[in-house]
C-alpha cells in the first residue's frame, strides 16, 4: 500500500513538471526537433535552471506537387551550439 502511494506521488511530481502546449511551437530549439516539418504540439520540462522544450507531435509539410515530407530524425538535425549546450546539460543531469 505504501509503495503504491509512493509511486503515485512520484508520477504526480513528474507529470506536474511537464506542461503540454497545443499551439504552434515558438521556441527555436524546440522547432529544430521537427526540422522543416514544424512542431504542432510541444512540451516543456521544468529544470532547476529553466525549461527544456521538446516536441510531442511534428506536422508534415505538404508541397504543392502533392509530395509529403516526414519529420526529420534527430540524426539529421544540424548540430548547433544550442544543441551542444543542451546535450552538455543532459549529460550533467545524468551524472546527478
Swiss-Prot record:
GO BP of this protein: defense response to bacterium; defense response to fungus; killing of cells of another organism
Post-translational modification: Contains four disulfide bonds.
Protein name in the entry: Myticin-B
GO CC annotations, alphabetized: extracellular region
Transmembrane helix recorded as keyword: no
One matching Pfam family: Myticin-prepro
InterPro entries, alphabetized: Myticin_preproprotein (IPR019631)
Keywords from the UniProt entry: Antibiotic, Antimicrobial, Disulfide bond, Fungicide, Secreted, Signal
Localization (cell): Secreted
Function: Bacteriolytic activity against Gram-positive bacteria M.luteus, B.megaterium and A.viridans and Gram-negative bacteria E.coli D31. Possesses antifungal activity against F.oxysporum.
Proregion residues excised on maturation: 61-96
